[in-house]
């Protein structure tokens, strides 16, 4: 099912529908836009018919210089069955040839009061957000000191309970149980909650609680960029866990690699505090302060001095 249709653009940007009402359910599959200037000159070899077409002052001024036959020919070629729509900007008058071609092909012809550049920028941002690659991950997403932390792990390991403790400590819940993730840009993942379970947290033995109702609007967020993954797992005595912090794991979601930290879970460990510190330490590393690396360098210096003596 298409994520975006022409009617969505009409509603989102308050566009005026001139003709082609029967085509407003046409799908839009790309965020790229087209300003068919070279096509106005008659070159349709590489015409991107599947894109939203924008006709600004430049295109329509050139169009006025064409002969009557050329005008009809160019507009018929522009209005194809796969073209989502043509938008005339700046509230300019719609050429009769374009109106006729739109009616014959059933392609939506729209008009906007905005400038071409302004509308193009807004359309691109909207379409990139809607058409971005998406996936869903089982886990909890929390905003901790401005760091979007995705907490993962097997069912029953204590993800929701840890999230509840983090919320009580002043951090903000984004999503529990199912995190919808979309890649809005290269190396940029944004997580949010499905509408059905937004602001809800499930605690075994307690049931479902509404975090916003209990703790206020400051305890929740609608979406957050994900920069750190913390995986909770039951403590395995046979497994060697990182004790210095020099080894950095990675986890790939869609096309983006994120820093991953594995935290072993056992009675007596305050996971909320550990995750808080992990988020703060992650911020420090991004600022160029790496405590583990500094310790390693001091240790190597001490060893070298000891060998010299």
From Swiss-Prot:
InterPro entries: HPr(Ser)_kin/Pase, Hpr_kin/Pase_C, Hpr_kin/Pase_Hpr_N, P-loop_NTPase, Ser_kin/Pase_Hpr-like_N_sf. ATP binds at residues 153-160. It comes from the Bacteria. It catalyses: [HPr protein]-L-serine + ATP = [HPr protein]-O-phospho-L-serine + ADP + H(+); [HPr protein]-O-phospho-L-serine + phosphate + H(+) = [HPr protein]-L-serine + diphosphate. The active site is at 138, 159, 177 (proton acceptor), 243. Pfam families: Hpr_kinase_C, Hpr_kinase_N. GO terms for biological process: regulation of carbohydrate metabolic process. The keyword Kinase applies. Keywords: ATP-binding, Carbohydrate metabolism, Kinase, Magnesium, Metal-binding, Multifunctional enzyme, Nucleotide-binding, Serine/threonine-protein kinase, Transferase. Residues 201-210 are annotated as: Important for the catalytic mechanism of both phosphorylation and dephosphorylation. Residues 264-269 are annotated as: Important for the catalytic mechanism of dephosphorylation. Its EC number is 2.7.11.-, 2.7.4.-. GO terms for molecular function: ATP binding; magnesium ion binding; phosphorelay sensor kinase activity; protein serine/threonine kinase activity; protein serine/threonine/tyrosine kinase activity. Mg(2+) binds at residues 160, 202. The keyword GTP-binding does not apply. Its cofactor is Mg(2+). PANTHER family: HPR KINASE_PHOSPHORYLASE (PTHR30305:SF1), PROTEIN YJDM-RELATED (PTHR30305). Both phosphorylation and phosphorolysis are carried out by the same active site and suggest a common mechanism for both reactions. Homohexamer. Belongs to the HPrK/P family. This is HPr kinase/phosphorylase. The lineage of its organism: Bacteria, Bacillati, Bacillota, Bacilli, Bacillales. The gene is hprK.
């Amino acid at each position: 099912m298409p994520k975006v249709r022409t009617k969505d653009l009409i509603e989102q940007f308050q566009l005026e529908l001139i003709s082609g009402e029967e085509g407003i359910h046409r799908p839009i599959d790309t965020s790229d836009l087209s300003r068919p200037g070279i096509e106005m000159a008659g070159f349709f070899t590489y015409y991107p018919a599947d894109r939203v077409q924008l006709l600004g002052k430049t295109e329509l001024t050139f169009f006025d210089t064409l002969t009557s036959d050329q005008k009809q020919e160019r507009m018929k070629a522009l209005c194809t069955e796969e073209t989502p729509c043509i938008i005339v900007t700046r509230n300019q008058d719609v050429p009769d040839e374009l109106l006729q071609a739109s009616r014959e092909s059933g392609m939506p012809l729209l008009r906007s009061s905005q400038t071409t550049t302004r509308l193009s920028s807004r359309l691109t941002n909207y379409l990139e957000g809607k058409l971005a690659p998406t996936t869903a991950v089982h886990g909890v997403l929390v905003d901790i000191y401005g760091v979007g932390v995705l907490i993962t792990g097997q069912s029953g390991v204590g993800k929701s309970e840890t999230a509840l403790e983090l919320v009580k400590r002043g951090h903000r819940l984004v999503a529990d149980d199912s995190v919808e993730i979309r890649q809005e840009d290269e190396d940029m993942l944004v997580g949010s909650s499905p509408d059905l379970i937004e602001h809800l947290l499930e605690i075994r033995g307690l049931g479902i609680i509404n975090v916003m109702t209990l703790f206020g609007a400051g305890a929740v967020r609608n979406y957050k960029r994900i920069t750190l993954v913390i995986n909770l797992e039951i403590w395995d005595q046979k497994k060697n866990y990182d004790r210095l912090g020099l080894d950095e794991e990675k986890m790939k979601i869609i096309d983006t690699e994120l820093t991953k930290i594995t935290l072993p879970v056992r009675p007596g460990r305050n996971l909320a505090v550990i995750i808080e510190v992990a988020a703060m330490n992650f911020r420090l590393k991004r600022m160029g302060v790496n405590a583990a690396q500094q310790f390693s360098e001091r240790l190597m210096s001490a060893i070298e001095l000891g060998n010299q003596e």
